[in-house]
Amino acid sequence: MKFLVLTDIHGSIKYLKMAMEKLDVHGCEKILLLGDILYHGPRNDLPLEYSPKEVITLLNGYKDKIISVKGNCDAEVDEMVLEFPLFPEATIKLNNHTVTLMHGHHVDEYNEDGYVLYGHTHVNKVEGKLINIGSVSIPKDSHHTYAVLSQDSLTSYDLLTDEVIMKVVL
């Protein structure tokens, strides 16, 4: 099974639509959302085509395919309009690996075995088994990014060019 991994959408319908096109491109069956879905937060400028209502409509259409965790910009009201749960953390099993999904604002407190996929800082980074896939809509390292998680690897791509940004063999 392949997963499309997105984080830090921050209400941008423009970049969400582009990212969702990658479901078919890569043959992904599920979507992993790593938080900060609708609101841009007080520290970020508005992303291009900021439209939380359109983001809600688009994502709710995929509610049966989504596993999502709550980010620091996600509020209780977001959970009322999204038709899928926002978990504090989630865990999936791939082959012999455990992969924990979290937003990342508490990643320093993580001390379990296995891999961690997170966002929050908007920067692609790998530190051991901690993997940050950047941001779909408000990158801090110049790449709008998404990732594809398979049974044996995670590959992060530039959303605009499909250039491989990083690949981690699990």
Language-model features: locations:
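Conserved beta-sheet core of the metallophosphoesterase superfamily
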Residues: F84, N95-K167
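Flexible glycine-rich active-site/ligand-binding loops centered on an Asp-His dyad
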Residues: L170
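Core catalytic region of metal-dependent phosphoesterases/phosphodiesterases
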Residues: K2-L94
